[in-house]
Amino acid sequence: MAMVRQFDEETVLDQALNVFWQKGWQATSMADLAEATQVQRGSLYHAFGGKEQLFLLAFDRYERRFLSEAQAALDAPSASLALERFFDVAITNMTSGSPPRGCLTTKTAIESEELSPLIQARLRALLDALEARITEALSRDAVRAGLKLPPAPAAQVIVAFTRGLAVIERVYHEPAQLHALAENFVSLLLGPAAPGA
């Protein structure tokens, strides 16, 4: 007779996500995950396969939520409004939690010397998906007209800038500073359209 799980998988994944986000991939242990989820380590291994598999499933949730929020923010009638809303989402993502958790993608990428190929691929996939969504949003005629750069290069520098913001957040823990930096960055991107944009 098959054993019935005594826990809700969705709840466990949300709790695991919070632990990984708060402590980081490397510092999180299976004991931490068992304590946070109130599920024994053996049951976690049986249900999810191990720390890396649990991280990847939790990261799926993080990715879906973040990309959905970013997409909604980018759906604006002008470049300035789209970028303002996007950076609000990105900064809120970094500064949420108590204490603030930072950006899970950037924390994971920089915290350890070697990441498994699976985790590297997942981080890359999120950044690529984010860049694609930004490019698509900036390609709309009404939005593109306000940019100094063509949409694809603009999206690349926006994604790179968000990684810098994530590092600044870890050092200073000042949301107002992050918003000011984002506002200044947006002002550099806006203006007469680049030739051929």
Where are these regions (language model features)?
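Helix-turn-helix
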Residues: T11, Q15, V19-Q53, L57
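Hydrophobic alpha-helical connector segments
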Residues: L57, Q71-R101, P151-I158
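Short, basic, alpha-helical segments at the C-terminal edge of helix-turn-helix-like DNA-binding modules
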Residues: D60-F66
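All-alpha amphipathic helical-bundle segments outside canonical DNA-binding/catalytic cores
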Residues: P77, L81, A121-A125, R140-V157, ...
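Amphipathic alpha-helical segments used for helix-helix packing
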Residues: L83, G97-A121
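Amphipathic C-terminal alpha-helical segment
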Residues: N93-S96, I158-A176, L188-G196
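Hydrophobic alpha-helical segments that form the core
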Residues: R101, K148-I168, A180-L188
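Hydrophobic alpha-helical bundle segments that form small-molecule/ligand-binding pockets
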Residues: L115-P117, D128-A154, L190-A197
